[in-house]
Amino acid sequence: MNAAVIDSKHSQDFIVADLSLADWGRKELDIAETEMPGLVQIREEYKAQQPLKGARVAGSLHMTIQTGVLIETLKALGADVRWASCNIFSTQDHAAAAIAKGGTPVFAFKGESLDEYWEFSHRIFEWPNGEFANMILDDGGDATLLLILGSKAEKDRSVISKPTNEEEVALYKSIARHLDADPVWYSTRLAHIKGVTEETTTGVHRLYQMEKEGRLPFPAINVNDSVTKSKFDNLYGCRESLVDGIKRATDVMIAGKIAVVAGYGDVGKGCAQSLRGLGATVWVTEIDPICALQAAMEGYRVVTMEYAADKADIFVTATGNYHVIGHDHMKAMRHNAIVCNIGHFDSEIDVASTRQYTWENIKPQVDHIIFPDGKRVILLAEGRLVNLGCATGHPSFVMSNSFTNQTLAQIELFVEGSKYENKVYVLPKQLDEKVARLHLARIGANLTELTSEQAGYIGVDKNGPFKPNHYRY
């Protein structure tokens, strides 16, 4: 790789912001490894077997330092990898540089345009020497969507003829351009995919929809619903990274403010805890009576967005839904209200409706939306993931849980893929418990061991699994 590659955003080898950041990135990768015991131990356990030898992984997941450790783990187990970020703002440029310098084709930099984002999503499927990706590692489902929608458009271009938002404009234009060059670009690549492992709630929802409709073209493992992912990454990760993003972006004092968390799933629970821990009065909006009751029993006030809009100071969406905060909500907000999203896509806040007003950029990923009456609303990360757009995402330790699950899921689908139908699966309980076990020593936790008599009394193997699949942690 030569100097031209460093400066060009049109290289066929990789596209990163600045390769000179690689040494900094390598130092942070080394530090992160000390906080990612699951991935490190999986490398040691499987490196001799090389279970991913022959796997060509197309990865679409936030290109962070922690993701760099995941990529190097996949490669240590035999995989070839090409990588793009799954969000235009989430890349850490020094991480991308370090991974690119290490020989992995990476197509990611912080602040991509939507056109660049979808071009990079294509690049992870463009393998040299006539080869094709045979595995997808996805976060949010965009890589999976790209091949499936593109294959559909090969037969009927009308499916990409009516975009409804700026994201679809860029996506459809990108697909049309590739079809003009190769009318079977997508179906050719789709035919080689053995399966996908999906990281997040939003992407999993897409997979289940396709399974229900009979449109899922390959097996999928739902990594998100592994207990050691959803109850750790989603809850404890967001509990730390949400306020990190808000405070880096705004320097606001959270104590004494009224903060609204839209959605009280695992992500919302972590967000509410962190805001209350810093002294905010936390209100929750919910559609689900069970989650609403949970929030109320934890001492949060459960309200509607219509009620809260003109009263609260900080708004956080964590629903995975559409237009949870709409134009009229923002129009009603107080001067300098802070609005942000920690769900995967930018559709939770109706950002498009505010483009009619004046925007004033304060610094990267921090904008004032100036309404006609002079009131300003502070929008973070343009409504995209605030913890990755305005900070560095979840801590390494909790991401080790998630990425150990991802690695085990990739191994399972690649090695045992023939036994799976085109359905969505979760990892077995034994592997979930294994992931947790790998992380205990790092934080000084010691397990109590059942005696044979105790195991027999409750009807479990003394080495686990300890809970039935229906158990709710």
Swiss-Prot record:
Residues that hold NAD(+) according to the record: 200-202, 234, 263-268, 286, 321, 342-344, 387
Sorted UniProt keywords: Cytoplasm, Hydrolase, NAD, One-carbon metabolism
GO biological process, one term: S-adenosylmethionine cycle
First-listed, main subcellular location of the protein, grouped into a coarse class: cytoplasm
Residues of the signal peptide: none
Entry-linked PROSITE patterns: ADOHCYASE_1, ADOHCYASE_2
GO molecular function: adenosylhomocysteinase activity
Pathway: Amino-acid biosynthesis; L-homocysteine biosynthesis; L-homocysteine from S-adenosyl-L-homocysteine: step 1/1
Residues binding substrate: T64, D139, E199, K229, D233
Protein family per UniProt: Belongs to the adenosylhomocysteinase family.
Function: May play a key role in the regulation of the intracellular concentration of adenosylhomocysteine.
Database matches in HAMAP family: AdoHcyase (MF_00563)
Official protein name in the record: Adenosylhomocysteinase
